[in-house]
Amino acid sequence: MGVTVAIDCMGGDHGPAVTVPAARAFLRNHPEARIVLVGRQDALEQAMGAIGNGFGERLSLRAASEVIAMDDPPAIAMRSKKDSSMRVAIDLVKSGEAQAAVSAGNTGALMAISRFVLKTLPGIDRPAIATILPTRKGQTYVLDLGANVDCLPEHLLQFGIMGAMLVSAVEHLDRPTVGLLNIGEEAIKGNEVVKRAAELLKTSGLNFYGNVEGDDIYKGTTDVVVCDGFVGNVALKTSEGLAQMLATFLREEFSRNLLSKAMALIAMPALKRFKHRVDHRRYNGAALLGLRGVVVKSHGSADAFAFEQAIHRAAEAASNRLIERITERMTAMGVAA
């Protein structure tokens, strides 16, 4: 994995306190990789001074004088903060100094800046946000998760292509299955956009499974689930809320009385395995697909372990030629300009 990843160290809730240790952990696990830490010089030097370097030229610093706040409007962040850590990290991908960028910062600003600097791939109208969700069978990739609230059938087709190429690249599956999220499996179900998208996906050459319902996401029915950003974001946030509720219920029940606490001790090994399987930190890192460069968005509240997963996803996508795979597929379908 001999790639260079640029990291926006100032983004997210914790800034360098998380991003710098995560970068070091990633480099320890990937001896051929390189990282460029982008941020305010004083903040980076302070973070590096506390934990040291030890990686020589594999870990370098790039100064950026500005920081994009989580509540900055995307348009203002793009126009007025051209020396922000986020913008400089994306610029490094544009120039070829890095093959991927990772940020835990403002999602809207990251999408706007990435699209402005890197541009979209030939044949792709709109970038989409794709992430991994755990399933009974392992995991599935879902897109779009909020970048595109309203979509045309052609956009959903493009999402299917990009999602399939992402899974092919990072999971090494030749023909990943693609499902279209709908209110029923039958072809007559859904609105006109979804019905037309299903027709396009059927003739796309992708391994199109057909319509899938919400429960199919966690059954692992398909490797990729396609939907518009409105539906995808609601599905994601609903899932997160359900997971938090179940975790709260478990804590309350196992701490209700002495007998419950004793049962909790007995069940601890199984509970730890359960926690590992559903640990959202393991799935951190949403890819911004459709750009002429690899960009991954980390959750803003990510800890060092979770942020390291986002770095790994970015490096893996870049080293496995994700951008080239999408371009080649679009060209083969005759839709790349």
UniProtKB/Swiss-Prot annotation:
It holds the Pfam family FA_synthesis. One of its GO terms (molecular function) is phosphate:acyl-[acyl carrier protein] acyltransferase activity. It catalyses: a fatty acyl-[ACP] + phosphate = an acyl phosphate + holo-[ACP]. PANTHER family: FATTY ACID/PHOSPHOLIPID SYNTHESIS PROTEIN PLSX, PHOSPHATE ACYLTRANSFERASE. This is Phosphate acyltransferase. Homodimer. Probably interacts with PlsY. Pathway: Lipid metabolism; phospholipid metabolism.
